[in-house]
């Protein structure tokens, strides 16, 4: 669905095809049991289940399309300072004190949405007490266009295939204390821990990027539409990024 949206708004055409990676299979298993489930594109008569695209590439394609659109005026790097919602229109004050008016304001400004706060939309909040460690790794064995995720006792670990047959993007969700320990490890120590946690499924793993971490929280805004305002994407809801589906669910 998210790929179709990018096609429909003209952003997909700006993606470098050399950086796209289709995935034809998905495998999910539990480390402490025999539980396992697999999905295949062939089961639904498709060439692929979807594509793995780097976040930076998607941002660039969206930005390029916005720059090329005659229907969009970019006001950067200005930010919203205040919103006042009237019966007929919304009054917007930017951080340089310039003002705009609009009949509808759509907040697509992420989990910590300023638009949501200014609209006083209540939200349900849940802290998973976990951090997600993300990085790019090189694997000894090729990923064969398969997305994989293992559930470990301390949290799930996903390997998402990238354009190089031996490169994967990892999302390793761990309890906060365990994540802190993993981030303190040397690259060599981290590689060993990662390889073991993934049951050596793709052989020895090697970091080829810096490790980054972010807190995992569930947010669900109880109201998405109000007087002259609406919120979408992560501004409306965020969930645990299982199997790399967080962005897809945010878009759809």
Labelled PLM ranges:
Residues 1-23:
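Glycine-rich FAD cofactor-binding loop and adjacent beta-loop-alpha segment at the N-terminus
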Residues 6, 105-211:
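Conserved FAD-binding catalytic core of PHBH/FMO-like flavoproteins
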Residues 18-118, 126-131:
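Conserved N-terminal helical subregion
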Residues 28, 92, 159, 168-170, ...:
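Short beta-strand motif preference
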Residues 42-46, 140, 175-179, 236-238:
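A short, flexible beta-alpha/helix-coil linker loop
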Residues 85-89, 143, 250:
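Pyridoxal 5′-phosphate
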Residues 86, 153, 162, 225-226:
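Structural motif
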Residues 180-252:
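FAD/FMN-dependent oxidoreductases across multiple families
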């Amino acid at each position: 669905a998210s790929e179709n949206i990018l096609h429909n708004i003209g952003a997909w055409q700006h993606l470098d095809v050399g950086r796209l990676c289709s995935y034809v299979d998905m495998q999910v298993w539990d480390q402490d049991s025999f539980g396992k489930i697999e999905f295949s594109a062939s089961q639904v008569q498709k060439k692929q289940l979807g594509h793995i695209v780097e976040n930076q590439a998607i941002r660039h394609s969206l930005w390029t399309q916005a720059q090329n659109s005659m229907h969009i005026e970019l006001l950067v790097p200005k930010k919203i300072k205040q919103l006042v919602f009237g019966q007929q229109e919304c009054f917007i004050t930017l951080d340089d004190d310039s003002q705009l008016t609009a009949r509808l304001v759509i907040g697509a400004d992420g989990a910590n949405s300023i638009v949501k706060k200014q609209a006083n939309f209540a939200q349900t909040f849940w802290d998973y007490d976990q951090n997600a460690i993300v990085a790019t790794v090189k694997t000894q064995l090729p990923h064969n266009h398969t997305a994989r995720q293992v559930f470990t006792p301390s949290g799930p670990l996903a390997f998402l295939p990238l354009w190089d047959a031996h490169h994967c993007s990892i999302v390793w969700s761990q309890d906060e204390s365990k994540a802190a320990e993993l981030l303190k490890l040397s690259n060599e120590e981290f590689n060993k821990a990662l390889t073991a946690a993934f049951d050596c499924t793709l052989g020895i793993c090697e970091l080829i990027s810096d490790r980054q971490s972010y807190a995992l929280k569930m947010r669900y805004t109880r109201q998405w539409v109000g007087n002259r305002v609406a919120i979408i994407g992560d501004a409306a809801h965020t969930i645990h990024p299982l199997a790399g589906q967080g962005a897809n669910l945010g878009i759809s």
